[in-house]
Amino acid sequence: MSHRVSILSSHFSPASAVMASEKEAALAATPSDSPTIFDKIISKEIPSTVVFEDDKVLAFRDITPQGPVHILLIPKVRDGLTGLSKAEERHIDILGRLLYTAKLVAKQEGLAEGFRIVINDGPQGCQSVYHIHVHLIGGRQMNWPPG
């Protein structure tokens, strides 16, 4: 297994605490249109704990949560949208759908007191999977500034 695949796999395994950090995974990741681990989650090749699914968006619990609630929301079809910096006008609808779905999931998860939305973009933004995804984190008091 290549170093890059090992790091990306560690992001979704319980042993990730002893594996590579998110920063290392982001620095090892290569932006491309190649299938990602999220494509395998969408196709159910890799199990996940789904909390929301419709025809456009899949939301599931992060395997390495950064709060009591940590959910990833992804578009089911990437359409070249590997990161926010790659967004084009044709992506407006799915970007809005991801954020609106985050609001629905936050309500479903009981996050009435607030939550944080994060989109990492590129190596310096700590993006480790090049399939745009929204982190919904809540259930605790957040700090400012973030990382």
Curated annotation (Swiss-Prot):
Renumbered ranges of motif Histidine triad motif: 131-135
Statement: the UniProt record of this protein carries the keyword Chloroplast: yes
Keywords: Chloroplast, Hydrolase, Nucleotide-binding, Peroxisome, Plastid
Any one annotated GO CC term: plasma membrane
GO terms assigned for molecular function: adenylylsulfatase activity; nucleotide binding
Residues annotated as binding substrate: 135
Location, primary (coarse class): other
Domain annotation HIT: ranges: 37-147
GO biological process assignments: purine ribonucleotide metabolic process; sulfur compound metabolic process
Domain of life of the source: Eukaryota
Parts of the chain that traverse the membrane: none
Protein source organism: Arabidopsis thaliana
Subcellular location: Peroxisome; Plastid, Chloroplast
EC number, as in UniProt: 3.6.2.1
Recorded catalytic activity of this chain's protein: adenosine 5'-phosphosulfate + H2O = sulfate + AMP + 2 H(+)
Protein known as: Adenylylsulfatase HINT1
